[in-house]
């Protein structure tokens, strides 16, 4: 006779099927710099889009400075000065036709 309910179970363990779905998301994060200064980062934009052109349009439309950072794990990341989370989300939905369910906004 085997007792089944004494097995250890970790509810926070990765199930394995999350890997494919998490790579499809676009993550918009805000980071605190010094004082009241903030930095908005956008990662996970699909490869079919030209990130340099997107960055150029974002900088012009929002009136802020920005640059691209190459990361080994995350790939190409767009950085914008200031809290641009809502504007970037609206831009991705309207201009690039990315569904809202594929965009994750992080921050305080």
Curated annotation (Swiss-Prot):
Keywords: Protein biosynthesis, Translation regulation. GO terms for cellular component: eukaryotic 43S preinitiation complex. Residues 1-20 are annotated as: Disordered. Pfam families: SUI1. GO terms for molecular function: ribosomal small subunit binding; RNA binding; translation initiation factor activity. It comes from the Eukaryota. InterPro entries: SUI1, SUI1_dom_sf, SUI1_euk. Coiled coil: none annotated. NCBIfam families: SUI1_MOF2 (TIGR01160). Additional factor that functions in concert with eIF-2 and the initiator tRNA in directing the ribosome to the proper start site of translation. Belongs to the SUI1 family. This is Protein translation factor SUI1. It comes from Eremothecium gossypii (strain ATCC 10895 / CBS 109.51 / FGSC 9923 / NRRL Y-1056) (Yeast).
């Amino acid at each position: 006779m085997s007792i089944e309910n004494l097995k250890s179970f970790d509810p926070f363990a990765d199930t394995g099927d999350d890997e494919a779905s998490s790579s499809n998301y676009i993550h918009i994060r805000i980071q605190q710099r010094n004082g009241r200064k903030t930095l908005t980062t956008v990662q996970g934009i699909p490869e079919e889009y030209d990130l340099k052109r997107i960055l150029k349009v974002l900088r012009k439309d929002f009136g802020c400075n920005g640059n691209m950072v190459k990361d080994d794990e995350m790939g190409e990341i767009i950085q914008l000065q200031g809290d641009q989370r809502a504007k970037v989300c609206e831009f991705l939905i309207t201009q690039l036709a990315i569904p809202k369910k594929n965009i994750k906004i992080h921050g305080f």
